[in-house]
């Protein structure tokens, strides 16, 4: 009977040893996965930061925002001005003139007149781009949430939590902007 007890104890010790070895393998595997996620997240953050929003000054320096005046619109301007003044006189509202004037003088990045771009199409393009930005931010937030799992350094953890908060707030702002455009 004592022989069976020794065998069962040895068997239990063997199983426990194997379980511990397996757990160590899993821990090593998990650590490797976390390290891979960290490096891929850092790479993504570097990629995302290369596309960081630029200031208006930078855009002007790069001549992205150019003022261009189409000569055909200048030729039509006296006629449009007269029509707008007639409408303004008819409605007794001079306030119509200023927004229309500023709208017609506003230049587009695409060098097109505002009147030549349909409002619905422009809204659709803006909404599409905002939704794309939002989806990329959601992917970044997901990757940051995965990276949090294996962080042992408190500074990295604080940085990731801060970046997740920034992502979430930006996503909320973009969604709010999309809703206001709809």
Curated annotation (Swiss-Prot):
Disulfide links within the chain: none
InterPro entries, per database record: Flu_C_NS2 (IPR005188), Flu_NS2 (IPR000968)
A Gene Ontology cellular-component term: host cell nucleus
Annotated motif Nuclear export signal, positions: 96-105, 122-132
UniProt keyword terms in alphabetical order: Host nucleus, Host-virus interaction, Transport, Virion
Chief location category: virion
Compartments reported by the entry: Virion; Host nucleus
BP terms from Gene Ontology: exit of virus from host cell nucleus through nuclear pore
Pfam family membership, one: Flu_C_NS2
Functional note: Mediates the nuclear export of encapsidated genomic RNAs (ribonucleoproteins, RNPs). Acts as an adapter between viral RNPs complexes and the nuclear export machinery of the cell. Possesses no intrinsic RNA-binding activity, but includes a C-terminal M1-binding domain. This domain is believed to allow recognition of RNPs bound to the protein M1.
Quaternary structure, from the entry: Interacts with protein M1. May interact with host nucleoporin RAB/HRB and exportin XPO1/CRM1.
Family membership: Belongs to the influenza viruses NEP family.
Name under which the protein is recorded: Nuclear export protein
Provenance organism: Influenza C virus (strain C/Yamagata/1964)
């Amino acid at each position: 009977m004592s022989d069976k007890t020794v065998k069962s104890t040895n068997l239990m010790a063997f199983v426990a040893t194997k379980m511990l070895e397996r757990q160590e393998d899993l821990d090593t595997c998990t650590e490797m996965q976390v390290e891979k996620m960290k490096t891929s997240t850092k790479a993504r953050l570097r990629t995302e930061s290369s596309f960081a929003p630029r200031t208006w000054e930078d855009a002007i320096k790069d001549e992205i925002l150019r003022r261009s005046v189409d000569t055909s619109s200048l030729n039509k301007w006296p006629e449009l001005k007269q029509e707008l003044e007639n409408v303004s006189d008819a409605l007794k509202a001079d306030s119509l003139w200023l927004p229309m004037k500023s709208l017609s003088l506003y230049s587009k990045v695409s060098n097109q007149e505002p009147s030549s771009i349909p409002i619905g199409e422009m809204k659709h393009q803006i909404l599409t781009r905002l939704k794309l930005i939002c989806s990329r931010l959601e992917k970044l937030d997901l990757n940051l949430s995965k990276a949090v799992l294996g962080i042992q350094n408190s500074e990295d953890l604080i940085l990731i939590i801060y970046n997740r908060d920034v992502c979430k707030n930006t996503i909320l702002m973009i969604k709010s902007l999309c809703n206001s455009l709809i």
